UniProtKB/Swiss-Prot annotation:
This is Transcription factor BHLH089. GO terms for molecular function: DNA binding; DNA-binding transcription factor activity; protein dimerization activity. Keywords: DNA-binding, Nucleus, Transcription, Transcription regulation. It holds the Pfam family HLH. Gene3D superfamilies: Helix-loop-helix DNA-binding domain. Residues 156-192 are annotated as: Helix-loop-helix motif. GO terms for biological process: regulation of DNA-templated transcription. Residues 17-29, 44-53 have a biased composition (Gly residues). Interacts with RSS3. It comes from Oryza sativa subsp. japonica (Rice). PROSITE patterns: BHLH (PS50888). One of its GO terms (cellular component) is nucleus.
Length: 265
């Protein structure tokens, strides 16, 4: 068995057992051990111990040096080692954060590029067809369809006629609401109709009485009679010839009442 690897292993264990109190002494021991290993490996290679073992020792020597340098930096008890570890940790964190930020930026850029590509590929939606009729903002109770213009004109005419009727009917301006206005107008028209009927009946009665009075007196005696209807009033006689020329009884009554009565003083 070759004593070089065993000696290297024993020297390797010494820094871990030494702990943090050794400080710089542990580092020097490791450097001496590494140099001894290299010397033994060179001697064995020069002594002809075997080509394969020498090559393996040469390969293991730089690895041991790297590990020893790492152990010196981490296991050293002084403040210099801790400062190095802290600075390395900060550098590592800074590099990691910068890497994360760069990755986020690249992801955002790729997303924006994909979105722009998708927007370019997808065409905009077609515009809705325009309506043939003119859209008018509807008031309360008004339609906005294609027949809205004619409907609005008809309602405006109705409202104008209602205003005219309100002006004709007395006291209708005080009423509020179309239904109540129509009721007032209907009642007024019915009252006028009843008055007209009453006046027509009275006129028929007067005409019948006048006709009966004319038939009671013959035409030859009609002109010679003088009627005293009231004290102090005289009645001018009318000749039958003037009555027979085409005057109706109603006209004759109007003439007698209107201009043939004179007050005697």
């Amino acid at each position: 068995m070759d004593p070089a690897p065993t000696l290297a292993a024993e020297l390797w264990r010494t820094p871990y057992l030494g702990g943090g109190g050794g400080g710089g002494g542990g580092g020097r021991g490791l450097e001496a051990a590494a140099s001894g290993v290299t010397e033994q490996s060179n001697g064995s290679r020069g002594g002809g111990g075997g080509g394969g073992a020498g090559r393996r020792r040469q390969r293991e020597a730089p690895a041991l040096e790297d590990d020893s340098s790492r152990i010196v930096s981490t296991s050293g008890g002084g403040g210099g080692g801790q400062d190095l570890t802290d600075s390395e940790a900060k550098r590592f964190k800074a590099s990691k954060s910068s890497g994360d930020n760069s990755s986020l930026r690249t992801e955002a850029e790729t997303d924006s590029r994909n979105a722009s590509k998708s927007g370019d590929q997808n065409p905009p939606p077609p515009e809705p067809p325009k309506q043939d009729y003119i859209h008018v903002r509807a008031r309360r109770g008004q339609a906005t369809d294609s027949h809205s213009l004619a409907e609005r004109a008809r309602r405006e005419k109705i409202s104008e006629r209602m205003k005219i009727l309100q002006d004709l009917v007395p006291g209708c301006n005080k009423v509020i609401g179309k239904a109540s206005v129509l009721d007032e107008i209907i009642n007024y028209i019915q009252a006028l109709q009843r008055q007209v009927e009453f006046l027509s009946m009275k006129l028929e009665a007067v005409n019948a009485h006048v006709n009966n009075g004319i038939e009671a007196f013959p035409p030859k005696d009609f002109g010679a009679q003088v009627y005293n209807t009231a004290p102090g009033l005289t009645f001018d006689p009318q000749t039958p010839r003037e009555y027979a020329q085409g005057s109706t009884p109603s006209e004759w009554l109007h003439m007698q009442i209107g201009g043939t009565y004179e007050r005697v003083t």
